[in-house]
Amino acid sequence: MTQDWDAGRLDSDLEGAAFDTLAVRAGQRRTPEGEHGEALFTTSSYVFRTAADAAARFAGEVPGNVYSRYTNPTVRTFEERIAALEGAEQAVATASGMSAILALVMSLCSSGDHVLVSRSVFGSTISLFDKYFKRFGIQVDYPPLSDLAAWEAACKPNTKLFFVESPSNPLAELVDIAALAEIAHAKGALLAVDNCFCTPALQQPLKLGADVVIHSATKYIDGQGRGMGGVVAGRGEQMKEVVGFLRTAGPTLSPFNAWLFLKGLETLRIRMQAHSASALALAEWLERQPGIERVYYAGLPSHPQHELARRQQSGFGAVVSFDVKGGRDAAWRFIDATRMVSITTNLGDTKTTIAHPATTSHGRLSPEDRARAGIGDSLIRVAVGLEDLDDLKADMARGLAAL
């Protein structure tokens, strides 16, 4: 027999709750079965009581699900939990991080609009703007991420959107989000921040003045390399446009992946703190090694934006990049000599990963575009996982010995 639960009942009143409580409980609704964990709704469609009920739901006259391309209870719980953690009015989940960017730009920009995108972004993001959005008549320029004067100078009367990663992939470059938001708003534009590297556990861009936050949930939100997904979170009328695009175009998140991400969120802050602590220790160790030319990690006092990172983030994240002496051949020898870390381009996993950005994530860019993004042949990116730090250092020492 089922228990006497109110279907759709919210888990509890969480107004004013702290981050860790929201990460565990926000958005959860129990079914009449009274389950304690989040229910997984693997259904494509929903049954209506009558023809009139179906018509009313499709017309939006009464609440309720009609089709999982539009809404799904498991996905909705994930969306509401992300919105609570980011301080957003609404969040909408997508099939991948790239589809989140697609939904954002296709929803908010039209042919003839102008978009400013940082040079310091993921290689596929550059390809999306350069190869595809330009086909639709959207103009794109790429100012340097941290040069606020360059952003202001690059604005045009038709500038609609600023898009940045902060910290950037893979060089951990930052922008003063509050200052950039002021410039964008003065020019009548919106600011979107890809918060993938920090997650809301370490940085909340909306509270700093950004209008929209983007995530690849595939990374630290999942945390264990299991599922793919993305999120757009924001405030105001722009989110209605994003929801409308996603319901029509269809790059929606699978319920199973939403359920995985809910499990990941429960340990998000704990994991990000552990990732950050190990990454900082590894960056400090690498900086002392003779085979390393430069380390890119905002937690290091030597990083040119260390103080900015301390001001707008509560931690420095898991990604440590560094240049080895000797160019591409040396970088490949370093990578191939490791025995524990995984050679893969994904990040955000409990397992440490290592990659050569110039020939993987940024490999499809022209040499000129890679140079503008600061991606050299000697660069290695390590996304620090949750293994023992001494074991990780020992594996990096194998790489150093191969130089």
Curated annotation (Swiss-Prot):
UniProt keyword annotations, A-Z: Amino-acid biosynthesis, Methionine biosynthesis, Pyridoxal phosphate, Transferase
One Pfam family, short name: Cys_Met_Meta_PP
Cofactor(s) needed: pyridoxal 5'-phosphate
Enzymatic class: transferase
Gene from which the chain derives: metZ
Modified residues (N6-(pyridoxal phosphate)lysine): K219
Higher taxonomy: Bacteria, Pseudomonadati, Pseudomonadota, Gammaproteobacteria, Pseudomonadales
Subunit structure: Homotetramer.
Superkingdom of origin: Bacteria
Protein name: O-succinylhomoserine sulfhydrylase
